[in-house]
Amino acid sequence: MKLLISIEYRTRWGEQLVMRIGKRRIALQYADGGVWTGAIERYTQSEDTEYRYEIERDGACIRSEWRPHTLRLPAREGVRTLRIRDRWQEMPSDTSFYSSAFTRGIFGRGKTGSPKKATGNITLRVVLPTLRPDETLAVAGSGRELGDWKRIVPMDDSRFPEWELTLHTAHRFEYKFLIADRKTLTPILWEEGANRTWGELPGAGEHALDAAASPRFPKRRWRGAGTAIPVFSLRTEEDFGVGEFYDLKRLIDWAAATGQRVIQVLPINDTTMTGTWEDSYPYNANSTFALHPQFIRLPAAGVVEDDEYRTLRSELNALPEIDYERVNGHKLRLLRRAFERHGARTAARRDYKAFIAANRHWLIPYAAFCTLRDETGTPDFTRWGGFARYDRKTVDAYCRSHSRDIAFHCYVQYHLHTQLSEVCAYARDHGIVLKGDLPIGISRTSVDAWLYPHLFHMDSQAGAPPDAFSAVGQNWGFPTYNWERMARDGYAWWRARMAKMAEYFDAFRIDHILGFFRIWEIPTHAVHGLLGYFNPALPYSADELRGMGFDTQGGRYTTPAPDEHTLGELFGDLAGEVRATCMKEGRLLPAYATQRKVAARFPGDDEHQTRLREGLMALLDDVLFIEDPRRKGYFHPRIAPHSTHAYRRLDGERRATFDRLYTDFFYHRHNRFWQESALRKLPVLLSATEMLTCGEDLGMIPDSVPETMHELQILSLEIQRMPKTPGELFADPAHYPYFSVCTTSTHDMNPLRAWWEEDRELTARFYHEALGIGGDVPYFCEPWICRRILDMHLNSPAMLTILPLQDWLSTDGELRYPDPAKERINVPSIPRYHWRYRMHLPLEELLRKETFNESLHDMIACSGRR
């Protein structure tokens, strides 16, 4: 078949438009009026094929389309020539609607069957993702085929968001696109502007495809609501002491009943390290690919529902919170038993073999990691002797000698994948979007760090500067990314990670999106985030600092140099002991020179050791500059230095100089630098899948972050208690941007009711200023107050209002949990927090609360969300 291509594109002098299809490069020829044409004389590919247009200058690609086209040959026999009229696909201003959250979820068409086999001689093809499932794109026009404007002809949406209509005509005709009711074909909205005209008709043996049309409809601003809750926090009558993947089905039912469209969860990867409750932290996965065994529904994985099972399930489900150790211990024991019974039969199944083949690259190393972890009693692979460094041949031999254990872990992951895939399909069938969470870090004792240590800075820790959550900053302990090494293979690890996530989710939250601009990196010898610095960064050279009056030679300004006043403030009556045992000539002895050494020296919880430990930690924080560990002689100003003794000891002129260099460093020096850093990474990662991308952009935000998120159309996160406008105490939801996610709190914050009791003075200001209510402030956050706050958020312009389940329940005096303090999921200021919150009533009971559910449905509908 011969292909004749034409496309309109206004190039600049010296630019060349080319078509890339398969391995071919077709240089198009410039005609008149900005039109480029080209031909493929013999096209023999019968399957659908993707292609793109690119702009070249001097033989190099300088611009490419946002997404590919699909070439499909006409079904009609005898076609020898296909004429294609194309259009350049620029990134639209509403790319969110092109995500799978909309095309497969909210506006998804479900199982529409195979595309209609049309045998006409012309085809209209349009991409339009913003139509609801009860709507159809249609055409009306002149001529017999279109009923002389008296008929509404629906287009085929079996490849939604692509629409097609094939006609057979021998005459020119006029037409228009319109949106119609799917069932009745009653017109809802006609496109704007003059009628369209089909001019040149195809000749004998020809077929014409017009893919250049763009319907002229006003931009639609759909808004929806959703619920945020960790999977482990769900409760049903069928689970085993912890929320499970299958529990999401009941939550999906409830979301559909109340008019919600999104369910947002926390990370679901396996965090098993020690087998203790410390593994409950969902952001410390042992694999960024493997799913956590705690989420499995045991009977569906072959576990027999005998008396032992029923007794354990009853005991564990009766607990108000998760007993992490008992739940996971019993689950793994029962799964071992099921594997012994069903493992061989399962391994023979075709879908099991397909799962192994598709996931072998991470699954087998993960299974080996788990087996070695259990065998050695530690996830710290640096203590595994001959296995400390991953070697494929050595590990393959180990897997052969431990084949039963390897097969067991594969068996569990297969069932987890099967169950979650079933839930994912169930959500899409109900028009509900599952939104996942992409942690910014990986564990230093994980499969990923074991396999790919070159992709990470194992000598550093990721964290966050001081904020409302923690005065000394946060230290997450994760190694930071070696972006330079990752770039060498086009970020293959990230692309694989994203692709795996997209198997289950149609939207995701980038945890700490700032990490793609710059990460807060802390040396491994430090404990507090205060001793961190940004990476990448442009630290000051020693010469620059010297020119500003700060000579760092001899450790001045970079190591603590306390005077008597400082020691007295930090240690009180212990100052003499510190001076005598921990210091020499005004400096700390080497044994106390780092925070890790101090923590090891004073591990006790008694008052004496605690005071010494905390005082020495604070003393080590008391510096003005931190030397860059990879660039000796270059220095970062310490974050939040104004409360340090070192800052207070500066004279007035030097203090003013420091303030200027500090402000320049943190608020001006890096803006373009960090933006360029993010734009090298984020587009590659976002293009790896079709998921809707949302960013957690809270905290210390440089100007380049919202600019970049806007450019890449990543939804921002808006929280009333964490305003982004300087000087505001509370943000106004009425002023949130459309492309954003609006919520009352995150899992790191108190839900509404507990927050209400947190700071009475702040609550009073919120009551009077944000809610605009006079008089005495209620002591408790009464249901009517909660409802009013939720109404504010639902009526915001934000595309998505996703609220914690606790806050939805807070609007009902009978359904809300008696103790608001028990509803908190995490306290970031506590490094090893026990994550064990579970909703207090089963979802089956919540589904039966018809009056409550109808009230939520009405509240959501009245806000215009659907």
Which residues does each predicted region cover?
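Aromatic-rich carbohydrate-binding modules that target alpha-glucans
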Residues: 2-48, 56-76, 123-172, 180-203, ...
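A short, polar/charged loop/turn motif at coil->beta-strand junctions and beta-hairpin connectors
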Residues: 13, 118, 133, 149, ...
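Tryptophan-centered motif/residue detector
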Residues: 36, 58-64, 76, 84-89, ...
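Low-complexity, Pro/Ser/Thr- and charge-rich linker/hinge segments at domain boundaries
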Residues: 72-89, 198-219
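Catalytic cores of glycan-processing enzymes that make or break glycosidic bonds
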Residues: 98-116, 123, 202-866
